[in-house]
Amino acid sequence: MSFFTEVDTDLYRPDAFSGFDAQAKFTLGNARAMMWMCQLAYETAHGDKIDAILNRWQLTKIDVLERAVTSSLRMGQTRGIIAATDKATIVAFAGTDPVSVQDWVADFTLGRPTGDIHAGFDAAAAAVQDRVRQAIAGGIAARRKLFITGHSLGGAIGFATALRMIEDRALNLREAEVYSFGAPRTLRPGATARYAPLMNTTYRLVHGNDVVPSVPPPDLDFGHVGRPLLCPHGGPFDEAKLPQSFDDVPRFERQLLRGLLQFVTGPLDLPFRPRPFPIGPLLAALPPGVIDHVPDAYLHALGTPIMA
């Protein structure tokens, strides 16, 4: 991971979990908390920072995930954090570096699938399955509600993990809240059908013209799961616009057209206040569909920006 995905300790907001309610269904307060957990999941190389931030949020660290992955995709490791409150177990997965997003999009569009779940994401979930399962089982025994979350490719790893826990005969997971931010299409119809127990409590947030949720293209037969909440470039997300049932948006062709129009009409303003030099100017140089994908953009659209 590059410094794009890491945030100075003093920029992690102490109010990230102020609106978190483990007993609620979808709320923007829970979405904010989950997106901040996704941001922290990018920091697995900095154990002291993770400890300090979890303490700031009054969370208990259960595990830090960092495991090598052998995959057809450009994925070196599965990274994540497992933490808990007295009422919730939270499993958060990191995604990919913003500078690699264009390479990932190209990877997604090449080749034909051989299974009903994207092999790269399934391999990433398998790499940490035993440790994640142990944490989830412990949370269930302690009567804590399960939250699974991920940004970017981490959202896809979250879906693959949730499906593995559903299919685990001993665990037999049937209740969890799954939040993804800018996640790609992950499952084909057979796997989507098996994901049914969590379909209505899976929430996919998509910011602006983020290109990642539109891939792989539909001719490869991958689709989304859960209920989508979309917002315009710059936000805000509106809880009232969450549909009551599944929808497979955004469409590949529509997002691609938007991206092409942005390139033709000129550079896109950052939808958030930039971080200090050099990160701010470097983020501004990314393509529009990638700018809308970065954690800074999602946190801003959720009302808890990194740079307040």
Predicted regions and their residues:
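Non-catalytic, mobile gating and regulatory segments of ester bond hydrolases
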Residues: 1-149, 153-308
